[in-house]
């Protein structure tokens, strides 16, 4: 995920994000999920640094392996990162035939790159990540995630994703994947209408976008706005899907899956299934989470969310 700014309570001499209430525990506290916190026991702090954009920390947890934290908010853990990375990448790419050019916005840890590289039809993978430190730290501490950078099809651009998109020729990409963090601070722009308009312009007719779209348990007001914007901009298909990620707030995260006008895209029925046996080699390892059955099921919504999201289409 890309940069975000969050306020956090609790501090010790070790790190401002180690809880003063539960010594030796990392606690994730944010105005985006008031009244609750998620905590992991810290075995050892492995890295702390401050980039031009955010505070970066890596720690060894007792139960989820190594953990990457940006401005006090968990971005990934070794144990459950597969549930996010595999779904945000394969939901769009398995829904269109033979994707060739893919753009990743954010995703500095390299996990989305790893998943995109499983698709043999892909010829070009561009990634624009704003924070070079995230890339470097991920390569050092999360080699099984950052392995995506080793693919020769990958072109890394360090810079602002919004500006990058504005300079892209119209109709360049088959798919755009936006691996952003929460809509606060530097990532705020990645949830606003002009950004979605830039994505639509950068996609070919019938091209697809997959973007992080928050939790139905915490952010229905944000999701409502995103859905409304997407329905105005993407004239093909607009859908909300979700996955479970234990270390994300509320234990789940959603995605917007949209297509531009052109060849029809039915996201709920994957036409480009990825063969797990053929999708990995010794470098990447097998997929741990995504499969075609889960792909279809991810678009099934609880009634309360379904009512709100469907109402935005009327």
UniProtKB/Swiss-Prot annotation:
Residue limits of the PABS domain? 23-260
Biochemical pathway: Amine and polyamine biosynthesis; spermidine biosynthesis; spermidine from putrescine: step 1/1
Reactions catalysed, as given in the entry: S-adenosyl 3-(methylsulfanyl)propylamine + putrescine = S-methyl-5'-thioadenosine + spermidine + H(+)
Tissue expression per record: Root, stem and leaf.
- Any one Gene Ontology molecular-function term assigned to this protein's record: spermidine synthase activity
Q: Name one GO biological process term.
A: spermidine biosynthetic process
Q: Is Oxidoreductase one of the keywords UniProt gives this record?
A: no
**Disulfide bridge map:** none
In terms of Gene3D superfamilies, this protein maps to: Spermidine synthase, tetramerisation domain (2.30.140.10), Vaccinia Virus protein VP39 (3.40.50.150)
Q: What EC number(s) is this enzyme filed under?
A: 2.5.1.16
Binding residues for S-adenosyl 3-(methylsulfanyl)propylamine, per the UniProt record?
54, 85, 109, 129, 160-161, 179
Question: Which keywords does this Swiss-Prot/TrEMBL entry list?
Answer: Polyamine biosynthesis, Spermidine biosynthesis, Transferase
* Family under the similarity heading: Belongs to the spermidine/spermine synthase family.
Q: What is this protein called?
A: Spermidine synthase
